[in-house]
């Protein structure tokens, strides 16, 4: 129970870290159609960070990397990913629903690649380097195994987060966060097939290429239906918003309180955010957020939206910060002697470099590519406003 009190300094330092970082490393906030979604994203990524901090807290003592025994900390990971998947499905299905012209599928898939790849490849190569460093830069596997694991890490771990150069549990270096990316790609590649049911045309060439890539990912990565339910709920929300664009009742403070109550029930009674009832609760909460419920103006605030911009980098980078600190700066053996209070105070301190590095990554890796892609080609549809995705 005391562990929940340790979160207080974590969130206090987060607040000041985001404020100060945005004063020093300035990034403008774009006009978007759903600012509440942008505001939500940053918190989701930070909850994933806390999820992995709890896992590390157990791992340092037991050497077992396993889901948190705490309902809250398990929801920090699982429910946050559920929301990420719903956001992806909602935004892209909404774009299809708002399409009045032909959809440029070639640009769509290229833009997705260049949106995800730059920040990812930097972190993936960092994982590879750390694994190589921890094996004393000696090649411990044959060339074919080395290339196989390297290729898997480069291409979003579609063949799994393979151990690199015989470094056991290589995935722990980045806290295993890459597993969600193949599922993102599965949805991206399913989109033209979904579009057919919405009378959005796609050529046979597009369907063949997308179908081939989809088959390759599913063949190597596999697919768990339980992870696809979140995308389905995101699709349903998109159709509902398209048919009923506004709902003042769902954006009220009373509904905000009701939404928080659902979250509390979900966390208290369920250990997993992937079970049907927690999924249903999450879908309802996401629905009211899309209906401009900002939860007492928190999600639509400039603070939340600035924090939300670094979501992807924060998601990818936090595991590296934890691993480098715990393994190479402090040392796992010394970390074992930390009391729980000492450990969570250390986590509080690590919030600062995590936010700063994520801000730098967004500004100098993600944002230039986002702007470059936008300048080169214009989407084959005219969205009502630009939603950065």
List PLM regions with ranges.
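Functionally critical transmembrane alpha-helices in membrane proteins and complexes, commonly lining
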Residues: 2-18, 35-97, 119, 315
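Membrane-embedded alpha-helical segments of multi-pass membrane proteins
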Residues: 4-11, 38-43, 79-87, 178-190, ...
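Alpha-helical transmembrane segments in multi-pass integral membrane proteins
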Residues: 22-36, 50-73, 94-106, 163-167, ...
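Membrane-interface helix-loop-helix regions
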Residues: 65-79, 107, 117-185, 189, ...
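Transmembrane alpha-helix boundary/anchor motif
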Residues: 87, 91, 232, 284, ...
């Amino acid at each position: 129970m005391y562990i929940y009190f340790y979160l207080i300094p974590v969130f206090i330092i987060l607040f000041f870290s985001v404020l100060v970082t945005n004063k020093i490393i300035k990034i403008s906030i774009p006009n978007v159609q759903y600012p509440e979604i942008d505001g939500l994203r940053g918190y989701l990524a930070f909850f994933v960070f806390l999820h992995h901090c709890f896992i590390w807290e157990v791992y340092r003592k037991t050497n077992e990397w396993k889901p948190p025994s705490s309902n809250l900390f398990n929801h920090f990971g699982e429910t946050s990913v559920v929301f990420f998947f719903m956001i992806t499905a909602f935004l892209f299905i909404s774009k299809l629903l708002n399409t009045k012209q032909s959809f440029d599928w070639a640009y769509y898939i290229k833009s997705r690649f260049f949106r995800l790849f730059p920040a990812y490849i930097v972190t993936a190569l960092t994982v590879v380097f750390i694994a190589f460093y921890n094996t004393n830069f000696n090649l411990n596997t044959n060339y074919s195994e080395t290339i196989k694991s390297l290729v898997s890490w480069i291409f979003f771990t579609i063949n799994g987060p393979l151990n690199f150069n015989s470094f056991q549990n290589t995935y722990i270096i980045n806290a295993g966060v890459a597993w969600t990316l193949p599922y993102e790609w599965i949805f991206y590649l399913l989109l033209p097939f979904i579009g057919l049911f919405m009378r959005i045309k796609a050529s046979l060439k597009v369907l063949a290429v997308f179908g081939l890539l989809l088959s390759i990912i599913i063949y190597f990565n596999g697919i768990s239906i339980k992870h696809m339910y979140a995308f389905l709920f995101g699709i349903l929300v998109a159709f509902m918003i398209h048919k009923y664009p506004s709902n003042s009742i769902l954006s009220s403070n009373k509904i905000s309180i009701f939404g928080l109550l659902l979250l509390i029930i979900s966390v208290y009674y369920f250990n997993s955010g992937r079970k049907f009832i927690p999924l249903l609760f999450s879908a309802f909460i996401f629905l009211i957020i899309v209906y401009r419920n900002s939860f007492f103006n928190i999600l639509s605030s400039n603070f939340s939206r600035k924090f939300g911009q670094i979501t992807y980098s924060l998601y990818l980078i936090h595991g590296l910060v934890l691993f480098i600190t715990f393994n190479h700066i402090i040392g796992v053996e010394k970390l074992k002697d930390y009391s729980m209070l000492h450990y969570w105070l250390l986590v509080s301190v690590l919030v600062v470099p995590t936010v700063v590095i994520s801000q730098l990554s967004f500004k100098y890796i993600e944002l230039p590519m986002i702007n470059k892609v936008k300048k080169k080609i214009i989407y084959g549809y005219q969205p009502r406003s630009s939603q950065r995705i």
